[in-house]
């Protein structure tokens, strides 16, 4: 079995694959100070670690990447595949500096390698990423503040605003502080998506599919006016495609 790891700034999204499909997924917090042995112990609490024979990693947190590299060498006696320079991805990158494009964006694009139609991937995470892919090429990206970061900014930089759960309030116009904040985060994100999709459409002047992914996509999808498909495992599917391309 292959352990797929998408290491983000807030959480680590994991999948177990038999090399054909993703069988199960798990999520744990990203903790910079955690040691390789501590991470390994956490992995064992999720699934039978003895079934794992290989690791594939996409990461935007170098320090945690190093921890999992050590796990690979110490416990599995092999180097994990890490998305980066020298790894065959099947994705071309048409940007000013391709090296600065994150592994998670590349995995998202690699997941739609069989889609011949231009596609906008919207990945809602610590940062919201809008990735335009055409002919297996990333041609442009938008990055905005993610919902959790916006929530933390509201709470941390104001004296009177309370902590809140990220849920959809009953109406767009709130009648109490909690609902007002929830509306700004949920309906505000949906409006951001709809507005940027419209502007991208004006710029590219062609029809494209829209795929929504990321941990909070389940909350946001129904609030958007834009027709879209939700694919929560997109980044792991792309990481699996990249792993198979290199093995």
Model regions and ranges:
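Short coil/turn connectors at secondary-structure junctions
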Residues: 1, 77-78, 116-118, 126-128, ...
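Gly/Thr-rich phosphate-binding beta-strand-loop-beta motif of the actin/hexokinase/Hsp70
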Residues: 1-23, 117-136, 154
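N-terminal glycine/serine-rich phosphate-binding loop of ATP-dependent small-molecule kinases
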Residues: 1-3, 7-87
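Adenine-nucleotide phosphate-binding core of ATP-dependent small-molecule kinases
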Residues: 26-28, 169-206, 227-228
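Glycine-rich phosphate-binding loop plus the immediately following alpha-helix
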Residues: 31-35, 101-103, 108-109, 113-116, ...
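Glycine-rich phosphate-binding loop signature in dinucleotide/nucleotide-binding domains
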Residues: 48-51, 115-117, 203-206
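Short beta-strand-loop/turn "lid" adjacent to the catalytic site in phosphate-handling enzymes
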Residues: 49-101, 136-140, 144-147, 178-179, ...
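Long hydrophobic alpha-helical segments typical of transmembrane helices together
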Residues: 203-247
């Amino acid at each position: 079995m292959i352990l797929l790891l998408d290491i983000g700034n807030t959480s680590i999204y994991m999948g177990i694959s038999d090399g054909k499909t993703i069988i199960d997924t798990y999520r744990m917090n990203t903790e910079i100070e955690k040691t390789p042995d501590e991470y390994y112990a956490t992995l064992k609490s999720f699934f039978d670690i003895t079934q794992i024979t290989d690791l594939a990693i996409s990461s935007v947190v170098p320090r945690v990447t190093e921890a999992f590299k050590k796990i690979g060498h110490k416990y599995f006696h092999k180097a994990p595949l890490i998305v980066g320079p020298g790894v065959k991805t099947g994705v071309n990158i048409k940007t000013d500096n391709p090296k600065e494009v994150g592994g998670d964006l590349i995995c998202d694009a690699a997941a739609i390698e069989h889609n011949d139609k231009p596609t906008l991937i919207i990945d809602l995470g610590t940062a919201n990423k809008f990735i335009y892919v055409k002919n297996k090429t990333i041609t442009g990206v938008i990055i905005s503040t993610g919902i959790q970061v916006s929530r933390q900014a509201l709470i941390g930089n104001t004296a009177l605003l309370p902590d809140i759960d990220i849920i959809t309030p009953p109406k767009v116009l709130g009648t109490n502080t909690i609902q007002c904040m929830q509306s700004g985060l949920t309906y505000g994100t949906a409006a951001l998506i709809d507005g940027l999709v419209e502007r991208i459409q004006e710029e590219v002047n062609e029809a494209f599919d829209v795929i929504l992914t990321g941990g909070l996509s389940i909350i946001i999808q129904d609030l958007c006016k834009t027709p879209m498909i939700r694919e929560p495992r997109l980044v792991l599917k792309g990481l699996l495609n990249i792993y198979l391309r290199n093995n």
